[in-house]
Amino acid sequence: MDFARFFLKKGEEREIRQGFLWAFDNEIERVKFFDEKEWKDAPFAEIVSEGKVKDGECVEIFSSAGGFLGSGIFNSKSKIAVRIVSDSHANKIFEDKAGFIFKKICDAYNLRRIHFSDEDSFRVCFDEADLLPGLTVERYFSEDKKIYLVVQFLALAAEVFRNEILSALEKVLKPFAIYERSDADVREKEGLEKKSGWLGRRGKEEIVILENGVRISVDLARGQKTGYFLDQKLNRAEIARYCHGKNVLDTFCHTGAFGLNAFKAGAKSVICADISSEAVEIAKKNIELNGAEKIVKTVCADVFELLRQYESDGKKFDVIILDPPAFTKSARAVKKAYGGYKEINLRAMRILNPGGILVTCSCSYFFDPNAFYSMLANAATDSHRRVQVLQKHGASFDHPVLLGYPRSEYLCCAICKVF
């Protein structure tokens, strides 16, 4: 096959050479393509407007000087014009497309097997970080000993390999059932329709998994994103070490998983708070699953208002967990997000007993570690408390960070002692 060659504008290759996997539409200068019997050269804009290279085709990326950078999938409907899938030339991929994908799935799965057992639930594939752009795969091991997979195809670069991916997942992971959750808005930016539902054999939409000895109900069809936030699994286990005999406040609790890990560790009392009534009902279900009703209580409230109210009432805690949703999903909103993160941290510090533990998280790539720890320092100053950072964590082992692709390093989790 004769694959089109996309040449970047001068200087635009730097990030890709450093490991970045996207080429944006405004970074591409010209394209060489094979038209009938000969190679032709045309401006990128002309290629797009005249459809000379079709969406979903594999193309090769070159620097302006002609240095080969990698092969990827083209999509004219997205600002991300090419998502790189290989450092090899395109013909290497298409000599054995099924084998190409099978190896990637095997590599990703075997990496997780170093840390997780057959009875664990974990992320098998973390899109670009596993060199499978746009593909997310979660593996859930249910209480009734069945393997469920939840898959997301969020980019055309994943969609074009759909059949090969599903075949590889069946062979490598041998799931009882696979549920597709390609229902995120980002698919529309890729020119793709949203999809969800069972792929082949049907299973139970709601299952129970065991995490760190805690029973958790996971709604595969309606739960947030892919059903459950597996990225905090190891952080929840680590935080539990500080909770024995303590009064714990778990804010933005969602499923109540942090609070229930605290309960499992022997917490004296736990309050799980969330503004979403739906989240509170999920937390209540999980509390009942674990027989924790006497220790773990729920509150449906705006966390900002709740922290103010607790401060006004003079209520104190030994451990406070702040695990908010992303306060910013764009670089433009970082300043506003900084204020939000600072306020909840400042107020949490004020209602901690001396020597209390603050667990504080941010899950936005745009709010990087420098901004996060700067915010934490300013919150400590304004709360007139001295703060000792005991541990710094990111996402669990199943969410690797790809150097050169900073979006894969999105989670900050700090365990702090507040004097």
Language-model segments: residues:
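Mobile active-site "lid"/loop adjacent to the S-adenosyl-L-methionine
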Residues: D318-R347
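C-terminal catalytic and target-recognition region of SAM-dependent MTase-like enzymes
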Residues: I357-F419
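Conserved SAM-binding loop of SAM-dependent methyltransferases across substrates and taxa
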Residues: T255-K268
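Conserved class I S-adenosyl-L-methionine
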Residues: G245-H254
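S-adenosyl-L-methionine
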Residues: E278-I321
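Non-catalytic accessory regions of SAM-dependent methyltransferases
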Residues: M1-F141
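Non-catalytic substrate-recognition/targeting regions of SAM-dependent transferases
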Residues: C125-E138, F161-Y228
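Conserved SAM-binding motif I beta-strand of class I
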Residues: S269-D274
